[in-house]
Amino acid sequence: MGQSFADGGRVQNESGVMAKMDWALGSFWTLTAYSDFAYFPWAKYQVYASSHSWDHFLQTTYHRDHWILTARYRLRSRMKGDATKAGLIDETSQRARLTVAYTGAQWAFRTQADATRSASQQTSNGYMLTQSATWSGLRGLQATVQGSYFHTDDYASRIYTYERGLLYAFSFPAYFGEGLHYALFLRADMGQRWMLIAKLSVTDYFDRDHISSGLQQIDRSSKADLELQLRLKL
């Protein structure tokens, strides 16, 4: 059974209306836009009364030969409870992204720039620059390297970006503060039955001397993750 889309993860305590447009501008350009209004008659998480939200999105894409150029902008306005839990305040977030991608026979490159601005009782800004390269020059062997620099005022202006993962998996981690993130992805298909995937990612923060808190606290400004996956087809 299909499931309707919603402002949250599922349709609950919500009604609304959405208008969307997809437009082909000639042979190479496409334009996508939507506007979504949602109303919540009852209280929900961090909102102590009935509320509403607006979500606007605009994206244009240019695709020709081996090149893809994408520009997108999203404006979202929501209501949330204030510190006294007695009233509601408006929270507005703006996100923009510009992506240039090239795909060739053996190499693929992707350059991405993100900017974000969140405004409520305070204003928070941030940006992120990401570069990735993928090589598939040998049969059954593929390698991807990705590096990012991020700088945001705080968690309110965090930036999400796609990162390749193991087979049937991917992630959209959030980055805030200031630092560098880099990752190396390797995949080897050995014959018809064996496949090995390895992923190493490292994040170095410039604005803190520890990461996380409680039992998950890391007492340094850098963290590394290593993932391995081995598959055998019987």
Language-model segments: what does each one mean?
Residues 1-234:
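Exposed, low-structure sequence patches enriched in small/polar residues
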